[in-house]
Each structure stands twice: as structure tokens, then as C-alpha cells.
Amino acid sequence: VERSRGLGDVYKRQSLYKGAKPVLWSVVEKTALADAEVEYEDHTSNTIYVKFLIKNSTDKDLIESNIVIWTTTPWTIPGNRALAYGKELDYSLIVVEELEEDSLAKINDKLIFASELLENVTKEIGIKKFSTKKKFKGDNLSTCECEHPFKQLGYDFIVKPFHGDFVNLEQGTGVVHIAPGHGDDDYVLGIENNVDIIQTVQDDGKYNQHAVGFEGEHIYKVDHKIADKLEEFSK
């Protein structure tokens, strides 16, 4: 009875709501897992760099340049709805001038990375020569509006960058791609900034109808298809 009254009080205060959040999930057993049930092992992940084209910004120098992210989970790209930067971090806008033969970047690409990671990222991407056009603090990204890299598949919505306390310079590009339905940090940032929380994966590990262009594909087997589509649509 007391529990029912307590629940009633919560309801009266309009503090009771229905929501969703990411949980540890077994696609084999099709059930949620507790932290104590999970054991970690060394695993080699497929990693990709992805460009998000800036279509609008109060900083006109950034328009038509690309914010670049790095991820170890390519399968989460269909669930992307935002980006995260560090507001006090230093970033650079570069223009590509010369490439290695096997690079997927393009001459005259305008790319944005954290300044401290510039040397490492350009080497990994296969950029031999570039010029730096602008240096700025992360807060300059706050007014940017980006295209989703799968816009041509129907992902026709704005992807906005937000400050994230978890963004660091340990690896990657200094910008994190945010899929609010697939990670704790992503979820919290999404809630705080009213970003849509989209679930793209079914209980069995296969994409649902929200992963347009990849419906029915298993997330453990789709990385190369994701990469191929990103290359196809790269501008």
C-alpha cells in the first residue's frame, strides 16, 4: 500500500514518465545483461573515419568544410544524430593538397580535427601535404549544422555538434559521433540537448526500419557495407 501511495505521489508531481535508455544486451539470448554477467576480452575492431559536411554556421569560414570523426563501431553510424566536441580544445581547419596513393581523402577536402591530433590523423588518412586555414576553440562548432553522411539514403536531418565533457585527445580526431540509442555518454548528451533517441537494432542484432538502407543486416557483419556506402557518398 505504501509503495502504491509513493508511486501515486511521484505521478502527481509529474515525475513519472516512460522512456528508454541503452542497456547491455545479448543478441544471442535476446535479453538484457547485468554488469556482473559481462566479461571483457581483447578484440580487434574495424575502425573508420567519417566526414560530416557543415552546411550552416555563424562562423562562415567553416561552411562546406567537414568535421571528421573516428569510430570503432561503424555499425552505429545509421544511429548517429549528433556530434560531440570539447569546448576548450583547440581545433584546426585544413585543406588537403597532396595524398598517398591509397588515401580515400580528396584533394581540396576541407577537414576539421583537434589540433593536437593533426599529425597522427593526417598520417593515418594518407594526407601527405596540407595547409592550415584556421585554428579555433571547440566552442566555434556550437552553431554548426551538418549533413548526415547517409543523407542520400534518406537521413535528411540536421546533425548538430554539442560540447561533451567526455571528449578527449587520447585517440581519434577530437570529435565524437553520437548515437544516443547505443551508448551511455551518447544517451546522456542526447537527453540534455533534446536529440532524438533512435533505436536502430532489433533484439536479434539485426537492423530495423530506422536503419534505412541496411534493414535486416546484422550489426556484426555490416561494417564493410557501411564503409562502402560512406565511400560512395563521400563528397
What are these regions (language model features)?
Residues 5, 17-24, 28, 43-45, ...:
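Generic recognition of stable, solvent-exposed alpha-helical segments in well-folded globular domains
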Residues 9, 36, 49, 53, ...:
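Alpha-helical scaffold segments in soluble metabolic enzymes
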Residues 23-68, 75-77:
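Active-site cores that bind ATP or allylic diphosphates and position pyrophosphate for catalysis
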